[in-house]
Amino acid sequence: MFRSYTARYTKLDSGYMGQLVEWPEVISEGEDIEECRSMLRDALDEMILAYREQGFEIPFV
């Protein structure tokens, strides 16, 4: 099943911060928007893995 999430990016002095609107615990930072987007995808993958291992329900749209 394909899940869709909305990312919100905030410009920081050190680069960008990204956070998923539907799953605010998934958050990351990067020096530029591309790095932030990539890091946010990695954070999402890790969070999904952790939730599955613990038997938690994964939020999705």
Functional labels for PLM-detected ranges:
Residues 1-6, 12, 38-61:
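Short, charged, surface-exposed hinge/linker loops at domain edges
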Residues 5, 16, 26-28:
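Structural detector for hydrophobic anchor residues on beta-strands
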Residues 15-18, 30, 55:
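Residue-identity detector for glycine
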Residues 21-23, 58:
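Hydrophobic alpha-helix-in-membranes signature
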Residues 24-35:
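A short, exposed loop/beta-hairpin motif centered on an aromatic-Gly-Thr core
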Residues 8-21:
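Short aromatic-glycine-(Arg/Gly/Cys) micro-motifs in beta-strand/loop hairpins
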